[in-house]
Amino acid sequence: MAMTTTNNNRAMTRAAKQALPALGALATSGMGQQLFMSGVNYAIEKGKQFVPNRRGGKKNRNTDMVAHPGALSGSMAAPVAISRIVRGSKPRFIRSKGSVTITHRELVGQFNSSSALVVNGGITGNLYKINPANAVLFPWLQTLASNFDQYMFNTLRLQYVPMCASTETGRVAIYFDKDSQDLEPVDRIELANMRHLTETAPWCEGSLRVPVDSVKRFMNDNSTVDPKLIDLGQVGLATYGGPGTNAVGDLFIHYTVTFYEPQPSSGLTSTLQTGTGSANAGPTLVAVATTATTTTVTFRSPGTYLVSMVQRATTFTGVTPIALTFNSNTNTTAAGTNYSANYNVTVPVPGAQMRFVGTGFGNYTLQVTRAKITNAATLL
């Protein structure tokens, strides 16, 4: 076999050597410089189409929106299909001398559409006071907060995540009020006058950053004359302009909070009583309204609960569930004097109710605590 020792491309090599001087002359000429700059500009324009602009380390959101004729600056166009991936949140703990700092995210609840203005699912009474001891706003954090005397929020943010179609009509608003005792807005004018407010369509995600300060406040674990001294404020979610009462989205709360001054646990069970010497204790998980024939227990937060009711009554007919599920129960009656009802219930949305029915209803003692379905209330 013969081995090739010569370069068969000598003709091409000679042609390349002859072309190099011509290319150099073209590159230094005016036309060559113009061609070079045209190529640079072309590369820059192409890069803008694929690389998002960065300003101050943050993504320029204007590059993510679809241009629509007639749309004003800052408006959002309804997408064909888009969703938020919600992943599990891992709590982060940082210990220092005399304090512990916690960063976490929690689900506050699911909210439904409404035609008229509905705030906090129709539950009144400053439902979402910003205090770690408020089990309605901080169902997970409250179990830790009950072991401390003081707190200070470092960051706090509300996030609305839609779960409805992009054809859903209406509005969703989330707001912050510095005064935890102010009444909820009763109309759209009052809502629009909120200093800290985010409004959006039901299908569009919304976020509201709550202003925080560097003030240590006390936990709300007992009766307080002026709640303004212990609460950072209150937040709320309002819906209006919708076609029905279907679910539109979830509300999440993100926070970093520091706890100070450990104490014996203040308890996790809500106790409500009427009568001479009565005393309420624990977190406010429910509201109670009673007449001579009915006692209605309204839940302020979703979850699974163990409910124990003892009430004076002439007769006891039973318990009616309203927008909640009975998992297990046991009822007993002492004819003509009182009844006892123990229930394990699952509450999907704020405002769900249990209605106790009978005659001659009087004083009661009600115990409510968060539980699992396996905490059965059945008498075997």
UniProtKB/Swiss-Prot annotation:
Pfam families: Viral_coat. InterPro entries: Capsid_prot_S-dom_vir (IPR000937), Viral_coat (IPR029053). It is found in: Virion. Its main location: virion. Residues 1-98 are annotated as: R domain, interaction with RNA. PROSITE patterns: ICOSAH_VIR_COAT_S. Belongs to the icosahedral plant coat protein family. This is Capsid protein.
